[in-house]
Amino acid sequence: MKKARILIVDDSSVMRKIVERSLRQAGLEIVQVLEASNGAEALVVAQNNALDLILSDINMPVMDGLEFVRRLRNVENAKNVPVIMITTEAGESAVVQALSNGARGYIRKPFTPEQIKERIAPLLEG
């Protein structure tokens, strides 16, 4: 598994830290964790950094995760970066929309480090 540069997008700074801690507890090799509090900030980070993976919430102010994923697919250096949605969304419609916008999968909150590893490790192999 390669050492990864990961962007975590969530409007809660506490949740961003929980996700980062879970990534490390899962034993994933991480070079750098970048953070953004909404989709608009995340687009700027994605445009200016070589990323290996993005983990994004769906419900955020300014630009939600669904719009972020849709717009990310038009960013030349980031259009192929895998995105996993991390969400409390109980309904399937938001998840289906995220997948149709280009997300590679989703993880429901609350989650365990094992769930994080199961979903993310295959995307970081190579």
What is each residue range found by the language model?
Residues 33-40, 95, 113:
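Conserved Asp/Asn-Gly motif in the active-site loop of CheY-like receiver
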Residues 13-34:
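Two-component/phosphorelay signaling modules centered on CheY-like receiver
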Residues 111-120:
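C-terminal output helix
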Residues 57, 87:
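Active-site residues of response regulator receiver
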Residues 60:
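Receiver (REC) domain active-site loop signature in two-component systems and cognate sites
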Residues 35-53:
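Acidic, metal-coordinating helix/loop segments flanking the phosphotransfer/catalytic sites
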